[in-house]
Curated annotation (Swiss-Prot):
Cofactor(s) this protein requires: [4Fe-4S] cluster
UniProt protein name: 4-hydroxy-3-methylbut-2-enyl diphosphate reductase
EC category name: oxidoreductase
Recorded catalytic activity of this chain's protein: isopentenyl diphosphate + 2 oxidized [2Fe-2S]-[ferredoxin] + H2O = (2E)-4-hydroxy-3-methylbut-2-enyl diphosphate + 2 reduced [2Fe-2S]-[ferredoxin] + 2 H(+); dimethylallyl diphosphate + 2 oxidized [2Fe-2S]-[ferredoxin] + H2O = (2E)-4-hydroxy-3-methylbut-2-enyl diphosphate + 2 reduced [2Fe-2S]-[ferredoxin] + 2 H(+)
Keywords noted in UniProt: 4Fe-4S, Iron, Iron-sulfur, Isoprene biosynthesis, Metal-binding, Oxidoreductase
GO MF annotation list: 4 iron, 4 sulfur cluster binding; 4-hydroxy-3-methylbut-2-enyl diphosphate reductase activity; metal ion binding
Binding site for isopentenyl diphosphate: H40, H73, H123, S217, N219, S261
EC number per UniProt: 1.17.7.4
Tagged with keyword Lipid biosynthesis: no
Record: active site: E125 (proton donor)
Keyword Repeat: no
Length: 283
């Protein structure tokens, strides 16, 4: 059984940067916290906790003088301001792509644009982006949501960084159909687009797909969805322990990809587990 790993599986630039900052802070040994999970990988969060980096929900949980790390998804503007007011040492690990989306929203809002954010309203990244709008702001998950919005003469559009370009294009087309001026910033991360395209090609060339990543990871769930649409024998797992050998009955080629928050050690463990199943079948 051949196992094919996607070229760009695993950590993207923003996640790699955030985790490096968190592990560096852990090695210093001072009291360190993250505002929410540093990335959407329970295994990475657990490893950091074991090293003394604790996730908290609010700035108020951190004592004055402590260090707080802003997660890769970013936080709401008011949360960042609260950390500064509390005299905490702030390590900003916000993904640069997310930061750019926040900046675009702030600028567009100041220039009188109503903001449309394409994404998941309950995702922490989107909640953070929305907080930078000074005026009206709407979150839409599809082009159909645009039809329910009020008429706007000036629309500024940005996207959650893990959205697909096709999805953004559909929403923009719906905004333009309603008339008025529209200014659009493509804030989708390049790594997201590359991973999704690779997943499509790989799913079309194998008998079974395994997608690795947190069940709370938006980009991993999107990868799994893309693969599932092309290949019914697609399985989403967080760890190697969730692999079922029954998945590989009659399979000659297995494709493996992983979300942007999935560490290499978990990818390696999953591949080792699949390879071990293959050896057992042979023996």
């Amino acid at each position: 059984m051949q196992v094919i790993l996607a070229k760009h599986a695993g950590f993207c630039f923003g996640v790699k940067r955030a985790t490096q900052l968190a592990f560096q802070a852990a090695n210093i040994g001072s009291e360190t916290y993250t505002l929410g999970p540093i990335i959407h990988s329970p295994q990475v969060v657990q490893r950091l906790e074991e090293m003394g980096v604790i996730p908290v929900d609010n700035v108020s949980e951190v004592e004055t003088g402590g260090t707080i790390i802003i997660r890769s998804h970013g936080v709401a503007a008011e949360e960042l301001e609260a950390a500064v007011r509390a005299n905490l040492e702030v390590v900003d690990a916000t993904c640069p792509f997310v930061k750019k989306a926040q900046e675009h929203v702030a600028t567009l809002s100041k220039e009188g644009y109503d903001i449309v954010v394409v994404g998941d309203a309950v995702h922490p990244e989107v909640q953070g982006i929305v907080s930078y709008a000074a005026g009206r702001v709407y979150v839409v998950s599809s082009h159909k949501d645009v039809e329910r919005l009020p008429r706007m003469s000036k629309i500024g559009v940005v996207a959650q960084t893990t959205q697909s370009f096709e999805h953004l294009h559909e929403v923009v087309a719906a905004c333009l159909a309603r008339g008025g001026e529209a200014r659009v910033y493509n804030t989708i991360c390049d790594a997201t687009a590359v991973r999704q395209e690779e997943a499509k090609k790989l799913a079309g060339a194998v008998d079974c797909m395994v997608v690795i990543g947190g069940f709370n990871s938006a980009n991993t769930m999107r990868l799994a969805q893309i693969c599932l649409e092309l290949l019914p024998r697609t399985h989403h797992v967080e760890t190697a322990s969730q692999i079922d050998e029954q998945w590989f009955k009659g399979v000659k080629k297995v494709g493996v990809t992983a979300g942007a928050s999935t560490p290499k050690w978990i990818i390696d463990e999953v591949i080792d587990r699949i390879s071990a199943i293959d050896k057992d079948k042979i023996s």
